[in-house]
Amino acid sequence: MKTLAAEPAAEELYETASFVYFIRWLWSRCLEPSFGLTTIWKFKLVPRSSSLLAALLVGLCQVSLGQDYDIEVPGQPPGVPVPKGVTLFQNVRIFDGTSPTLTAPSNVLIRGNTIEQISASPITVDANANAQVIAGNGRVLMPGLIDAHWHLFMAATPQPVLMTSEASYLNLLAARQAEATLMGGFTTVRDLGGPVFGLKRAIDEGVMVGPRIYPSGAMISQTSGHGDLRFLFELPRKLGGPLSNSELEGIAAIADSPDEVRLRAREQLRHGASQIKLMVGGGVSSPFNPIESTQFTEPEIRAAVEAAENWGTYVTAHAYMPRAIRQAIAAGVKCIEHGHLIDEPTAKLMADKGIWWSLQPLRYDEGAFQRMSPVSQKKALQVWAGTDKAYKLAKKYKIKTAWGADILFDAGAARRHMTDLSVMAQWYTPAEVLKMATADNGELLALSGIMNPYPGKLGVVKQGAFADLLLVDGDPTANIKLVEDPEKNFMVIMKDGKIYKNTLK
């Protein structure tokens, strides 16, 4: 009998148990008359005896735990790699994410994944540290950008492709979009709908390149709601029946009672959601619900809020109209997505209650408009017409406002991601825009509490904060249009202390 090199970790035992449970399920299914293998065999050639099943399971357990093979069982599963290097930025002016003015020429020392020191005086680094020194030559060092409403799974993928393709293919497209997002200067995104848990893990473990991800998982929607992406031939829904394609992919989760909403919310939390996303009103891209519709009941919304709060986090809700927004606030929702058709009393209510407003600069886009169905075109025109009023109300009542792009199904728009930031100069100064997309968005992300996947300071250049940084050729606090061309103007992109781009070598 061979001995193990190490005791199996709890995570590995759990994975083994899950694997065995899956095999038991598969074994029983293989012997059901309705399953394909039995139909092909035409006879039940494999006896359904408990002794054979037990022998199979014991064998699987032995293989899985390495008891019959010279397999070393590692002590821990792959962890998140923490950079151990040292980087020194010299002679940079700092936009710290909060102050509207740049600092005097300064030096910034990064050790591992953290900003260790900021000083106007020279910083001396131990010669043995093998530090990488980057001469800023007066350029601007600023926090990495944060998009508070992004969809890595859906931003650049056309909707028909999303709804009809294999999950493996869609994951590859999402991984490509993740790298493009980081190379655009976005070191963190709050992903508000889509199966990105595996992608997040791969990025965190250094397998793939991309931003930090605050995942919501599946968008929770009522039947006929904005997140009901089912084809008509998938209706009527049969209780206990198979899930729809969009649910199987993890894009959406349909729920039609407080108990079902609670279950769907808990499922996302089980996957590791940092916040829960509910569809509580009509949307533009969904053809079967009016933009004016109010979705879910207050008890249904409250069920999600309770599930999230029990996990130390919060619910954010998609809504455009005052009635839907008010119902969500009454049920305990902490953040409203969109809200472009809000009225003034509801805006004041948001300010009074301290509700976050995740608002996007949605505006007329000829290319996007022509690709829409007539139903969506009509709704888009309504929303676009409300954008200016929404931002003016947000400023008037000093509502806590987050910035995000919410680009969907449009590869061209995804490539122009940064223009959704520069266009904000219609309502805010460049420094205010940058603060919104860095420190303010970082404050919103912190609402995820104990479900925060990256507990630490984000969106600021301050001692002790995560080293998520951009070195910009020019002053974006004076000229916000610099962000429109990250390939040209972002000389260095650093995330978690690791340099992903450096054109100053």
Q: How would you label these PLM feature ranges?
A:
Residues 195, 204-327:
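Histidine/acidic-residue-rich, glycine-tolerant segments that coordinate divalent metal ions
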Residues 23-53:
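Bacterial N-terminal signal peptides that target proteins for export
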Residues 92, 451-452, 457-505:
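C-terminal cap of metal-dependent C-N hydrolases
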